[in-house]
C-alpha cells in the first residue's frame, strides 16, 4: 500500500493517507528508531531496529516482542581493568555504561552485566584496578567511581570561570590515564586538560 508511510525518529510517525496526516506509529517499543522492515507478502509482519535492539510485530505494529535474547547494542568505546579474569567496560548508546566479565564458567548472559553509568555511555577507563572514570555525552556526568568502596565523585568536568568562553565538548570526549602516573588524567574538549589529582583539579595544556 503506497499510502501507508512510516517516518522513523525518537517518536516514529505513521500515515495511512500518503502523508497528509500523521499519528504515533507505535507505543511501548523502540526509542531512537533507525530501520523498519515490512514483509512484502504480509504487511502485518514487521521488524523494527532501534537503539535497544530489534522488535518484532505480527499484527501491523499493534503489539511488539523485544528480542531480548540477542546481544545487540551500540558501543561507543570499550575499556578493561586488570582483574583476573579481566572485566570489560562499555559505553552504550541510550543505555549508559555497563561492566561485565570477559569470561566465566558457562556462557556470559545479560544478567552478568551491571550498570555503572547513565545517559549515552561514552568512555570508561580504569586506573590502579580501582578507580573508574566515565561520562555520558558531551562529557556530562563525568565522574570517578571507587570500585572498592562504591563511592562516586561526580561533576569532575572542567568549567572555566563564569564570564569566560566555555569549552566545547565532543559527543564522546576522550579520557586517558597517564601510563606513568595513575593519578594523572587527560580529558579533552576543544582544548586538552590535565589533572594531577584524579580529576579534582584541571589545567589547560593546549
Pin down the residues of each PLM region.
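Beta-propeller blade termini and top-face loops
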Residues: 1-206
Amino acid at each position: 500500500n503506497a499510502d501507508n508511510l512510516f517516518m522513523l525518529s525518537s517518536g516514529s510517525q505513521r500515515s495511512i493517507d500518503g502523508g497528509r496526516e500523521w499519528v504515533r506509529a507505535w507505543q511501548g517499543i523502540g526509542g531512537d528508531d533507525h530501520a523498519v522492515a515490512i514483509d512484502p507478502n504480509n504487511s502485518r509482519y514487521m521488524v523494527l531496529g532501534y537503539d535497544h535492539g530489534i522488535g518484532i510485530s505480527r499484527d501491523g505494529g499493534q503489539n511488539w516482542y523485544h528480542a531480548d535474547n540477542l546481544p545487540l547494542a551500540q558501543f561507543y568505546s570499550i575499556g578493561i581493568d586488570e582483574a583476573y579474569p579481566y572485566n570489560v567496560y562499555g559505553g552504550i548508546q541510550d543505555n549508559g555504561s555497563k561492566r561485565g566479565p570477559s569470561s566465566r564458567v558457562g556462557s556470559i548472559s545479560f544478567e552478568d552485566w551491571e550498570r555503572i553509568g547513565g545517559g549515552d555511555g561514552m568512555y570508561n577507563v580504569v586506573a590502579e584496578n580501582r578507580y573508574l572514570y566515565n561520562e555520558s555525552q558531551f562529557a556530562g556526568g563525568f565522574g570517578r567511581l571507587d570500585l572498592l568502596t562504591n563511592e562516586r565523585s561526580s561533576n569532575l568536568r572542567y568549567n572555566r570561570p563564569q564570564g569566560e568562553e566555555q569549552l566545547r565538548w565532543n559527543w564522546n570526549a576522550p579520557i586517558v590515564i597517564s601510563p606513568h602516573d595513575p593519578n594523572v588524567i587527560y580529558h579533552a574538549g576543544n582544548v586538552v586538560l590535565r589533572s594531577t589529582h584524579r580529576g579534582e583539579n584541571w589545567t589547560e595544556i593546549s
